[in-house]
Every structure is written in C-alpha cells, then in structure tokens.
Amino acid sequence: TVAYAYEDYFNGTIAANHGYDMYGALVKHSCVCQGYAETMFYLLREAGLSCAIASSENINHAWNIVKIRGNWYHIDATWDDPVWDMPGRSYHDYFLVSFDTMNKNTLINHTKDRTDMVVSAQWGDTYTTAVDTTYESGKFWNGIEKAIFYKDGYWYSISEGSSKTSFNINKYQYSTNINKVLYSGTAKWTTPSGGYYPGVYSSIYLRGDNLYFTTPDSLNKIDITSTNVTPTELINIRTQYNSSTGNNLYAFGEQYGKLVYFITDSPNIKKTKDSSNSSKYNKEYAEYTFEMCISHKWDAGVVTKEPTYTSTGTKKYTCTNCGETKIETIAK
C-alpha cells in the first residue's frame, strides 16, 4: 500500500525521498500525487489500456485518465487515499468517473476546479472527453470506504449494513453480478463523551483463506471457504490494552510492509507538529503491529511422498520468515 507523503510535503523533502516518482510509491510506500499518477499510469499501460496523466495548476494536482470499452474515465488514486494515512481505509469516489463528476466533487472541498486540466504522457488512443457515468452507480465498489481484496474470481469488501451501526462482509463475483454476504455484525463506535460515530469504521485484510476484520473492540478472522462462517477473536483491546470506552480500533491494514492497527478516540486520525522539533510530527493515536507474515519466502522444500508412475507425490515447503507451511503435488 501507499501513504501520502504528508510529512515530506510539510518539510520540503518530497524530492529527496522520491515522493514524485514510482520508486517512492512502490519501494518506499510513500509519495505525493505525481508518484501516484505515474505509478497508476504504468499499471494501466501494463494492462494494455489507453491512458494518460492529467494535471491542474488550479489545484496543484495530478491524476489519471483511462479508456475502457470505448469511453474515457478519470481515476484519482491520491484523492481516494485519505491523509493522514489510515491503514485499511480507501475511498472509491474518484474511480472511473466522468470529468463533470470529478470536478463537482473537487469543488466540495476546494475553491478552484480542474477546468484548466492538461493531458500529457498519453499512451494508446488520444484523449477526447470523459462524459460516461456507467461506473458511478450500481457497482460493487460504489460507496465502499475500505480496501477491497480479490481472490480466485471474487471481490471481498466490508460495507454498511441495514443501519448505521451494522456491517456486512461481502463476497462479490463480477462475472455473475452476484453478491453474497459472508458475515453480518453490529458495531457502535463510541466517543469519550458517551455518544457514537454513525457508520462503519471496520477494516478488512485478506490473507490466504483467512479474512481479518475489526470491530471497535477487537480484531477477528473468518475462513472464507467455510460454509458456516464463525469469527475467531484474535485481539480484544479492552482486555489486552485496557482501552476505555471511547477509544476504539479505527484502522487496520498494511503500512510500510507490515500489518498495523491504530487505537484512538476518533476516526479522524491525525498527527501534529512537535513543538520542539518543527520537522517532526507526533501521532495522536496508539499504533501496534499485528505479527503476521505478509510476504512468504519459501524454502527449497522437502519431499514428503515420492511420486511413482501410478500416483502423485507431495512436497512440503516452509516459509523462512514465519514458519507457515504449504503442500504441493508432484506429478507422477
């Protein structure tokens, strides 16, 4: 995942830390809009899609344009990634939208718009105009404010349920347009004063067949292959950290190559400048690491069953980082 290089932006160290390029995004996991746009441009191009980078001096910003099934759309990966960085949280308001929709959303928080847009670095077809709104409603990512994960033909997400204090964990198949709710729950994100924040602030993370998700109190996992989905609680912040009501688990996800979760009293996670060091920013939340290997490194493997000319064999591999094992079949 990538975090917006907010501290570098404030400290004037963007260029020194590769915040303007793909190295910052893919290696350092931190960049500004130009780094997001160049990385997205590369990925779209690798997928064989006509695309370009767009920029606006009005709002000092860069984003992308892509052509799908004969129509052009805008993608702004930067503005769909909240700052300060909140692991697990990812918006989809600027994903495959028309220019008018993007510009309207821009004016919600800015006094200037993107009508001075300049298109550069075009690859494939030449950009004309982006007016189609096909992907702005009725799609599985519309309204989702958390990361979405893909595995074996299915997309996994978490969304608001039937009320402001309920949530659904979804398993969606794009080819059939069928969504299955794997698990439903309730969660109330309380405030220190006794109220609560309406909405879903849970996050999910998919690793193998295990889908991890958070509630205000706990980190849990479910087996996505199970016919009877029952959550297993892994961490309870009330007992493990003695966290009081009003302090909740608001963020969970991958950040800088590790899995982290934040405990704080507000969903609006932030940092403030250190009073004694102007280049340092202090976290207004407690950060913890969830010990799970997110990048397996398999050893050479050990044959556990020799193959014959009539039957297959098996070979066992062990991750040198975490000790997890896997079994692969050896052809007969």
Residue ranges and their predicted role:
Residues R69, F149-Y154, S175-T176, S203-N210, ...:
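Short, solvent-exposed coil/turn segments at beta-strand boundaries
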Residues N71-Y183:
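His-Asp-centered catalytic microenvironments across diverse enzyme cores
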